[in-house]
Amino acid sequence: MASSSPMFNDHAIARSKYALNSVLQQTNELHDGNGGGGYTPSSPHLGGVSLNKSQNQPYTQYNNGGGGGGGGGGHINPMHLNLNSITNNHNNHHNHHPNTLSTPHNNNHNNNNHSTSHHPHSNSVANGGHLSQSITQQRGGLADLANAVINRKNRSDSVQTKMKPTDSASNIESWAKVEKFSSSIFDSEKSKKSNIFQKYTLRLKNSYEKGYLHQHYNSQIMLLRITNLIGIVAVSYGFTKEAIFMLIAIRILCFNLFAFSIFLSFLRNRELYKKLFHPLFLFSFTTFFITILLEYKTTTTTLILFLYVVIFCCLYALGCLLFIWMVMCNLMNAICFIIFIFLESTLDRNNLISFVIYILTMFLVGASHLYVLEKFRKESFIAEKKLIKESNILKNEKEKSSKLLNNILPDFIIENIVYDFEKRDIVIPEPEEYKSCSILCFDIVQFTNMSAKLDSPSRLVDLLTQVFREFDTVVLRNGCQKIKTDGDAYICACGLKSKKKAKKQMPNSKSTPLLQSTSSTSVNNIDLDKDNKDNNNNNNNNKNSNNNFKNKNNIINNNNNSNSNNNNNNNSNNNNINNSGNDDDDEEIEDSELEHFEKLIDVAIEIMNLDVLKETGNTEGIQVQFRCGIAAGSVYGGVIGSQKYQFDIWGDTIARSHTLEQLGQPGKVHVGETIMTHKNWLKKWQYNYNIVSNSECKDQEHDYEFHKAHGECITSYFVDWKDDYREKKKKDLSCDFSINKVLNAETIESKSNNNNYNNNNYNNNNYNNNYNNNNLNNNSNNNNNEYGSSSSSSSVLGEAVTEQIDCNNTNPPLQHKKSQSILTNNENDIVSPSLTSNSPILDTTVNNNNNNNNTNNNNKNQNNIYGNNNNNEEDFKIKSKSNSSFEIEMSNIKKPKSRFIDRVMGILHHVKISNDKIDKEIIQIDEDFVKVTKLRKYFLFFENLTTEKFFHKYVIINNVVETKFFLVIGLILHLMFYLDDHIMDSAPYFNSNVIYLVMGIAFLVYIGLSFTRIFRTPLVYQIAFFILLCAFGVCTVLELIRFQNPLARSSLTRVCATLFYLNVFHSLNFLSVLFLNLFIFSFFIICSILISPTLTNHLYETDYIGFVIVLLIQICSSYGMKLAMRKAWVVNCKINFKTISVNKEKDKFNFLLKSIFPQSALTKLRDMIDTPNIETKGIVYVQPHQDVSIMFIQIAGFQEYDEPKDLIKKLNDIFSFFDGLLNQKYGGTVEKIKTIGNTYMAVSGLDGSPSFLEKMSDFALDVKAYTNSVAISRVVRIGISHGPLVAGCIGISRAKFDVWGDTANTASRMQSNAQDNEIMVTHSVYERLNKLFYFDDEKEILVKGKGKMVTHVLKGKKDLEQTNKWFTKPPEVWEVNATPAGIASPLSGTLLGEIGSFTTPRFHLSS
């Protein structure tokens, strides 16, 4: 390749008629043996084939011989593409195309289409292949695929407004839990017998039982204390009465037990009481009941019965003991009571039976109530645990998606991506134009020779991994953005600023933003532009103030700043705190391109000097040389296609950058004249950079082909650091890494500790801090050095000002291990006495000649040193036992730590910021859920009536068995009341037999109806059971109204049991239960006063007190139980809601993986996303394959004056069709790798399919047939090869699936040598497929880097049993009659401007 390095004039290009269509810059250009492009710039190309109006190529042999790199992209060197590059010979194209569309657009060409000329050679089978020969049968499939593509082409038309939500909190039906639990929460891993025991004793699995006991204890601790305190009061009251010695001894024992329980509950270490409170409670209340029996054995036994019922009604209702312990307590007291009445009382047999009935009734109703209550409690506990687990899973899935997307696509693309849950598809925003940016392109020199030195593709990939990882670090550190790597090519940019705003989810939308943009500190070029702007503002601000630290990117800019006012720092510092910059807006816009360019120059020079490029710097021991080119201007950027998403850029700027790279020299930074002649260039950069004109440009001044491609030729330049500036930059970098090496370890440790402390929340204040950072409204104008140092600079006036931190004089203690202790928050750490304000690294003052200014500015600079970055800085402020000035100075160390680590290690993968964003998203989900499930706590009613409806459905369905059981209990209770009346021969006031009969029938009817679905309706259930319980209470009161009322206390006991029974129906609304309790209580009082006035004569004050206590406790217990039930349901629904969200997040994640990576790599990549070192090493996945096939498809034939945006849209439609064809017909075997400009790359055989090569050939024929039948204004050139290669992903950012190896290089060369509508294959492919496909005779071509190669042209498939059996050889002539077949071409409107229709091809064999 010629060594001359011409540069084209930007203004000349703008005037050139070829400028519009230069947006598709990336072509399939090959490297020559010296690493140069395989095509001379004198002949513009699209996809490696010259498409000038004149098909005469003076460098044809040179073009065909392009040697090249070995990689999935190294073999494809993205190159420039001007108008000529995408324009075919207009007449030639239409005169030789075998098929035409009968559309108004083509009428001028199709009026005489019956007489269309046809050429018998390569174009004679332009529609060749099995698909073309059977186009009549297969065109429907193509049309279907095209329809699928056309439905997706309008990517900017979000589907949000077309659908209702399926996963939002407002759609209650989607998450409201009404079904029963799928499995019992009491199952264990033990035997079935053990499961039965655990099920009926409500014992959880061992892993949960301990946790529930802990929660139960903490929730009941106050109630236990109050209960024990009441026991102490009751026992103390007994001491006021005379008693026998045994009673006094038991009371003393009971008093001590209650007191000991209270004492244990107030100990700091409550573990002992947590273990003992159940047996202590059981024993203490049993002894207390024994004291009651002994005290009242000489009184009426009915009082003891009443007290027994009151005590256990309260204990069962409160549920302060676990079910099994409460049952044991009741059994022990019941046994003691029964023994007492049989041994000590003088009751007759009927009374004894009556007492036993009441005792059993209390036990039966109480135990069943507590069983259901505890079951709900434990289900709620398990639900809360499951909710935490689901929340963590949801967060992890979101983190995976976030890491994956942010590693592949820029934030301003991610925030506009929408996931359509209904169609299970992703809506990608259309590419947009970025008006002002700079592009830097790298390419390895002599990559073919370098690859030959490595004995395996794996070693090549290892080398590229090491090199590009260092590239990524440099690019990120300088605030730029990596675009992509294509094999040995590396492309980055600065200044990509999206004008699109993130799409927000519509209220009625099934589509949701895939991942919202992270916080404003994330590394995307929106923020980087802000930094650029701030850096530019800083240039002017520094005229009046000396900052402690300068931004690294301002080192160059500050050289020419006037420091004449340096001595006025005392006033100017304060004046500039609230300034937003004094630069004129026009000047900022004008200079923004310079800021981008400056950063990329620093990046390029720094990369050229990396140690990894030296023989001793990489593990392979190979010197790696790069060429690079930098250009500034506008580009189009975005994502095209429907699979294997990748961000790419197109346009004249990238084309010029590639051309500069091609025409450059190894190890030198090559730029054009336009940016160098900018009015501020020399003023800003001449003192720091060596600028050398490329004198060899004159060789190209009279090259017609070059001018035709690129416009006028003007001088280009090589840029490098000056020696003194280079040394200072080295100091800066060494200081950066020496500091950040320590800080990085501390950051990781602090983040790890913080994550271990709380997996769900990220504490932004990891360190306690006494430093009061004033809230200054400093809009980053005083932009400080993000690396903790700056370089001295010379002003135009020759006045030297030193504003640096000398890394060479860094105090040794900072480099010693002990010095790391000052960066931690450990109180035992020792602070080195040498680390004081005199330490150069800790010095925050400006070392100018005015010492007074240093003193005056010190405190002010301490306040404004971080500008408006207060939030980030709080993370790393240090707590110290020393004086406050030391604390402030120590806080200044954190600047390089936070800026560097957050940018390089944190922001890119959003380690902390993304997690905070995900936390906010989850919190937002919770907040939305809370709004829908908002509860009126005083009335226990959901504000949302739909939510209330689903809650009652849930409770009813989950309590079907309990409802039946409690109806049976009610019937038994009613029978016991009847037996009691019958045994006691009571004389009721009303005819009780009729009342008992009616209620008995009612219970039987309800029991029968409970086996139907009639009670499943919430309203029916509420009304029916309200009527039943109201009738039961009224009947019970009427039944116990007797003449003379000899059993007044037993009647009161029966009313207490009735009130208790009203509360066991958990499905009944609280307001209904409250009304029933108050109604029955009032009705009993009214009846006892009005109907049976003598009843009150048999009751005492203690009876009334006990009765009221039972009523209040029942109401409170019912409120608490139903509130807990509602909370438990909300938790279960939240689990259901988050489970749905998790599943959808998994769907999105899996869809993303499938849309970006081949199926064969998904499993390993899923695991890799979770690895800790992905934050520092990125995605590193490499897999060698011994035999796979590679294909390159180049699209050409675009119109001469198409707008760039239209060209990209047309390519998007074509590539989306290819994606759909692969997905529908060849999914799993043939995989898309990527698109490079107008070239589509695919691989076959990664899944190990034995027919991979045949399927690849079928796909090539399908693509060719599609292009010639649907997109007839296009031509394709296809190349196929097969052999070994390495596939995988490498890089810290923008890591995409790619392949490397000579097989890919060979396929690229096949494509570059193919003619229009040809499928060129290697001889090895021919040998494998000659029995299945038709091929042309072999042809020997000269390929640079490979020598002479035997190739073949694939024509069609022999096996046509499904189509035309009469074919015995490939057809030589196609005749197509323009008879409309009525099959619409969905893509024709996009590709040709209007809707067209297929013509019916009729094939005739020529003699």
Curated annotation (Swiss-Prot):
Tissue expr: Expressed throughout the structure in the tipped mound and finger. Expressed primarily in the prestalk region of the slug. In the early culminant expression is increased in the posterior prespore and anterior-most regions and expands into the developing stalk. In the mid and late culminant it is expressed throughout the stalk.
Keyword Thylakoid: no
Enzyme Commission number(s) of this protein: 4.6.1.1
Sequence positions that bind Mg(2+) 1: 443, 488
Main subcellular location: membrane
The keyword Chloroplast belongs to this UniProt entry's keyword annotation: no
InterPro entries with a match to the protein in the record: A/G_cyclase, A/G_cyclase_CS, Nucleotide_cyclase
Topology versus the membrane: Multi-pass membrane protein
Domain (Guanylate cyclase): residue spans on this chain: 438-661, 1189-1311
Residue spans of biased composition, Polar residues class: 51-63, 828-846
Domain of life the protein comes from: Eukaryota
GO cellular component: cell periphery; cell trailing edge; cytoplasmic vesicle; extracellular vesicle; intracellular vesicle; multivesicular body; plasma membrane; uropod membrane
Side of membrane Cytoplasmic, spans: 1-219, 374-962, 1399-1407
Cofactor binding mode and count: Binds 2 magnesium ions per subunit.
Cofactor: Mg(2+)
Name of the molecule in the record: Adenylate cyclase, aggregation specific
